[in-house]
Amino acid sequence: MVPATGQLALLALGILLAVCQALENSTSPLSDSPVAAAVVSHFNKCPDSHTQYCFHGTCRFLVQEEKPACVCHSGYVGVRCEHADLLAVVAASQKKQAITALVVVSIVALAVLIITCVLIHCCQLRKHCEWCRALVCRHEKPSALLKGRTACCHSETVV
């Protein structure tokens, strides 16, 4: 059986990719050795004369420009961190509201689940639970009482 043209093309492509990858991963030494870059900080501490330069941030002194700059705290913007970022404040407030709502909904759902489990357990063991019997007996049809049958509650019998 002779392979189809498409299969031959895929086979050739696979061989070509394998050869290229083998050449790419060669272990021959590099011709030029890497040169370590000098580590120089672009920032220094601000001088004492600029300790109060930033209103809501940390002062840094730019080495190349020889002037102070500010790294603003979250929620503040501006050259000297003098403006409140209203979008950040609103986003933080919305996040707190969402977390509060989630906690409240979780507590309510847990309370409903616990009450449901207690009611199911109580109704399965009706004879041991007075308040469950009172709930069931309140909804019992009066016709059952009038025919001389015993009611679900032991305290209610018709003479």
Swiss-Prot record:
GO molecular function list: epidermal growth factor receptor binding; growth factor activity; receptor ligand activity; transmembrane receptor protein tyrosine kinase activator activity
InterPro entries: EGF-like_dom
Lipid linkage positions (S-palmitoyl cysteine): C152, C153
Keyword hit for Secreted: yes
Domain EGF-like: 44-83
Keywords: Cell membrane, Disulfide bond, EGF-like domain, Glycoprotein, Growth factor, Lipoprotein, Membrane, Mitogen, Palmitate, Secreted, Signal, Transmembrane, Transmembrane helix
Cytoplasmic side: 124-159
Disulfide bonds: C46-C59, C54-C70, C72-C81
Glycosylation sites noted in the Swiss-Prot or TrEMBL record: N25
Any GO BP: ERBB2-EGFR signaling pathway
Domain of life: Eukaryota
Gene3D superfamilies reported in the protein's UniProt record: Laminin
Propeptide: 24-38, 89-159
First and last residue of the signal peptide: 1-23
Gene Ontology cellular-component terms listed: basolateral plasma membrane; cell surface; cytoplasmic vesicle; extracellular space; perinuclear region of cytoplasm
Bilayer-crossing regions: 98-123
Intervals, Extracellular compartment: 24-97
Assembly and binders: Interacts with the PDZ domains of SDCBP and SNTA1. The interaction with SDCBP, is required for the targeting to the cell surface. In the endoplasmic reticulum, in its immature form (i.e. with a prosegment and lacking full N-glycosylation), interacts with CNIH. In the Golgi apparatus, may form a complex with CNIH and GORASP2. Interacts (via cytoplasmic C-terminal domain) with NKD2. Interacts with MAGI3.
Function as written in the Swiss-Prot or TrEMBL entry: TGF alpha is a mitogenic polypeptide that is able to bind to the EGF receptor/EGFR and to act synergistically with TGF beta to promote anchorage-independent cell proliferation in soft agar.
PANTHER family in the record: PROTRANSFORMING GROWTH FACTOR ALPHA (PTHR10740:SF1), TRANSFORMING GROWTH FACTOR ALPHA (PTHR10740)
UniProt name for this protein: Protransforming growth factor alpha
Organism: Mus musculus (Mouse)
Gene name tied to this protein: Tgfa
